């Protein structure tokens, strides 16, 4: 069993909300962030916790799942000012599930590994 069942979902559109709801059904604590206020309200209505910033959303989470639109958004969410890498603990698992070019996915993974993430 996973000791820390706190998982962050960044991007609460159709895919992200589906993932968040599935995690909630399996008794995970789900923290989320999205630029759309309605998506945040929907997460809270389902039993999740919405945070006002990416950094606040990832703090204390054992994993973060990124489900945004493209590589530009992934870059901002992970590596931008107050992005996920600034708030995640070393060793946290990062699952990048956005549609991005293969070269970007490889580079992104390498950067995350160098910073101590799985």
Language-model segment annotations:
Residues 1-66, 92:
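NAD(P)+-binding Rossmann beta1-loop-alpha1 motif at the extreme N-terminus of oxidoreductases
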Residues 54-118:
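Rossmann-fold NAD(P) dinucleotide-binding segment
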């Amino acid at each position: 069993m996973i000791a820390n069942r706190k998982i962050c979902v960044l991007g609460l559109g159709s895919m992200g909300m589906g993932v968040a709801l599935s995690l909630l059904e399996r008794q995970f604590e789900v923290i989320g962030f999205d630029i759309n206020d309605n998506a945040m309200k929907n997460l809270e209505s389902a039993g999740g916790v919405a945070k006002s910033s990416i950094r606040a959303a990832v703090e204390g989470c054992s994993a973060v799942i990124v489900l945004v639109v493209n590589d530009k958004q992934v870059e901002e969410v992970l590596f931008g000012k107050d992005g996920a890498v600034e708030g995640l603990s070393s060793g946290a698992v990062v699952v990048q599930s956005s549609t991005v070019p293969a070269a970007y996915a490889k580079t992104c993974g390498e950067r995350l590994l160098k910073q101590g993430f799985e």
